[in-house]
Amino acid sequence: IVNPNNPNGRCIAPGFLVDLAKRQHSGGGWLIVDEAFCDVDPDLSVAPHAGEGGLVVLRSFGKFFGLAGLRLGFAICAVPLSLRLEEALGPWAVSGPALHIGRQALLDKGWHVFARQDLQARRKRLDAILMAAGYNVVGGTDLFRLIGTNGARLHRQMAGSGIWTREFDFSSDILRVGLPGDENDWSRVEAALA
């Protein structure tokens, strides 16, 4: 289960997931929860319960920290499974620089608070721009927005302005739009949507 889901941002209550994991475990199964987009809303995380009742939590470093090229992820789980994963992955599953950068970023709690506030403000600003341009925001997280539209048409329109969006093969009527960075990017997005 992906929580928040990608690409629609739909969230599942943590209590439900913990209960589901217990039910899975009682039948000999696991519940794997991918929390790649969870850093923007830590209250959604079931990581504190990882290892209980067959619950495995996967976390991805690059999304929240904006370091997509840094290949770093985590499996939070019971010790026996952790040891099996460690054995399967070998001694150098993650590079030394990735570990160092990841550790520094994870420990910088002040930056986490700032980033969450900044992302939320930018998400609200993008929502206002999209709605003013006549687009319906149908989902997303504080990292991206999902709009209901002719995805291919708007994707081409935005690409013509050098703005990359994400289309989906499974649905031609949605498009994912990332948050602009600086004021120049915001101006370019507004102009491309006009």
Give the label of every model feature segment.
Residues 1-5, 32-34, 138-140, 168:
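Short beta-strands and strand-loop turn motifs
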Residues 7-67:
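Active-site pre-lysine segment of PLP-dependent enzymes
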Residues 15, 19-22, 121, 125, ...:
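Alpha-helical scaffolding segments of alpha/beta enzyme cores, especially the outer helices
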Residues 54-131, 135-137:
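PLP-dependent aminotransferase class I/II
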Residues 70, 141-143, 173-175:
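Short amphipathic alpha-helical segments
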Residues 119-120, 130-161, 179:
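Conserved PLP-binding catalytic core of the aspartate aminotransferase-like
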Residues 146-150, 159-194:
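Conserved PLP-binding active-site segment of the aspartate aminotransferase-like
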